[in-house]
Amino acid sequence: MSPGWAGPVWGEPSAATEAPVPLRRRAVASEACYRADGGQSAEFVVLAASVAGVAHRLSGRRCEDAYAWALPRPGRLAVIVADGVSTAGRGGEGADIAVSAAWEHLLAVEGWGEMECLAALRVASDAVSAAGCASASELSTTFVVALVSASEAGAEVRLARVGDSSAFILVKDRWDELFPGGAEDELRGSVVGVLPLGSRGGDAVETASVLLPAGAALVLLSDGVADPLRDGPGTVAPALAEVLSGGPSGALTPLALADAADFSRRGCQDDRTILAVWPR
């Protein structure tokens, strides 16, 4: 392992991982550079990992991604990923606020579909606005939420997002992105939408739905993983698919997923979050 603590090399390695990680002046568990969790219910297997990108580690900054899941009742699962905007100033704090607000809201709702997805997004946006007041733009964050309902055929999924955090279906080694335009927007240099809604003038909210078959995985990713996944169809995509293949059996642990999320790849220095769901 390199002094910079990077995980596996997927593609050309990043030279930045050769530098030792400096000791941060201030660190608390809630702002850890490495986070991982997971578990199983009667209907779902869930694994999540979030790691600070090498750029943040070397500059002594926290991971500015956040994730959460909620299991309000049997057969229902909500999963959320947010990516705080580094240039905003307090993006990591905004991601934490958005995820926490949506998580709490979804634990109490009656319905479980597109309307609830959109309501959770609005609740998250309002929470970020209220926390930041006139400076709410400093808390800017992307946001993606998926509501999963167990069914005999697999699982029904409803999603909503703002920004470039995304969602994929993984079947064996095939990745299908559920929101259109990810790669095209990157090429055009499009302005990324964020919460709070309206802070950038035209933050488009997108929705999607899919039937997740048995054996497939729903994978939510921050752009620190989604971008290299799209750019590396012969490296990152098959390597991550191989890692995730151990999820349903229990062979993949949260710590092993965090190690994979910390892959070394030239030019990829952003924070990375992976949240994967398999119906049982």
Question: Model segments located where?
Answer:
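Short amphipathic alpha-helical signal-transduction/dimerization elements
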Residues: 99-110, 241-245
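C-terminal catalytic subdomain
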Residues: 1-28, 191-280
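PP2C/PPM family metal-dependent serine/threonine protein phosphatase catalytic domain
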Residues: 48-61, 125-136, 169-209, 213, ...
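Acidic loop->beta-strand submotif enriched in PP2C/PPM serine/threonine phosphatases
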Residues: 61-74, 137-149, 154, 158, ...
